[in-house]
Amino acid sequence: IGHALAAVAADVLRDPVALIGQEGVDEFGLQAPKVHRGLLISGDRFVSTTAESAALQRELPDALAVEMEGASVAQVCHDYGVPFAAMRTISDRADDAAHGDFARFVAVVASRYSLALVGAWLAGLPAIN
């Protein structure tokens, strides 16, 4: 499931201007968004400083991002033998330079990527009779 989802995501990311507009690309400094496949770690709080980010990188150097919801879903899927893949739109680098308007990022960037990704993923599934 991960490989197929990554391929769909790569297609969705090809033209950020078409998806979110030049204004959104400029506002959030988006440059050549791409898919990263690897380890997501789960936590119970936002990582918002360079010191916190560096400490996590020392402890878990293979981690690509920190998220707060997916681990519980992944555990249930594992327990029941259901395939699972998590997809995240990364809003910042988890450091002191993180932009402050997360709600705007969700509205302008993440929601549009999510809608396009889910739509493309569903369009590629076989029809149910």
Regions found by a protein language model. Give the residues of each.
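Generic structural signal for well-ordered, non-membrane alpha-helical segments
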Residues: 1-5, 33, 49, 66, ...
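Predominant activation on well-ordered alpha-helical scaffold segments within soluble catalytic domains
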Residues: 6, 71-74, 78, 115-119
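A structural motif corresponding to the C-terminal end of an alpha-helix
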Residues: 12-13, 31, 76-82, 121
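A C-terminal functional module that forms or caps the active site or interfaces directly
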Residues: 43-102
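Mid-sequence, gly/pro-rich, charge-dense loop/helix-turn segments that line enzyme active sites
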Residues: 1-60
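His/Asp/Glu-rich mid-to-C-terminal helical/loop segments that flank catalytic regions of hydrolases
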Residues: 94-129
